[in-house]
Amino acid sequence: MKVVAFNGSPRVNGNTQQAIEIVFEELRKEGIETELVQIGNKRFSGCIGCRKCQETKDMKCIISDDGMNEIIMKMKEADGIIIGSPVYYGNITVPVKALIERCGTVSRANGNFMRRKTGAAVTSVRRAGSNFTYSAINFFFGILEMVIPSSTYWNMTLSMAPGDIQKDDEGKTVFVNLGKNMAWVMKKTME
C-alpha cells in the first residue's frame, strides 16, 4: 500500500509539510509506503471546462505543459491521498485548488478512478479559516466517493512561523491519530 501526499504550501519544510510527516511516521509504522510531492511552489492553472478529458478518456488533462498530468497519475496509482494546505485568505492555496479541479474532472471522466481510495486533509492556520480549508479538501474527497478517516479533532495545526507546529501538542496528537486511523481504514478497505 502507498500513500502520496501533496503539499500545497509554498514553504518546503514548513508547518504543513511537518504535519504531513507526522502522519507519514504513523503510516510507515504500519508498513505503508509514503511519498511527498511538493506542489505549493508550482504554477498550475485550474480546469478550463473544455471537457476534452471526457472525450479522450486518456487519464489526462488537455493542459499538458505544467506537470499536472504526472500528479494525476500519482493520484491514480496511490491507495491513499493526503492533501495539505495552509490557510490562504480563509481557504486552500491556488495549487491545491488546481489539483482538486483538474484531478477531480479527469477522474470522473475516466470511471472515477479515485473511488474508494482513502483521502485525508491536513491544514495549518495562523488564526482562522482552517474549517473552510479542511472542508474544501474533504468536499473533493467526498464527491469522488473516497473514504475519509477522522481524528480526535479537525486535522489542523495552529502555527505561523516555520516550526510552530512543534509547539502545538494538540495538533501533533491530531496528526498522529490521523495517521493511525488512515492506516486502519486503508487496511480494512483493502481486505
Predicted regions and their residues:
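Short amphipathic alpha-helical segment that frequently serves as the phosphate-/nucleotide-binding helix
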Residues: 17-21, 134, 172
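Short beta-strand segments enriched in small/hydrophobic residues
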Residues: 2-9, 120-123
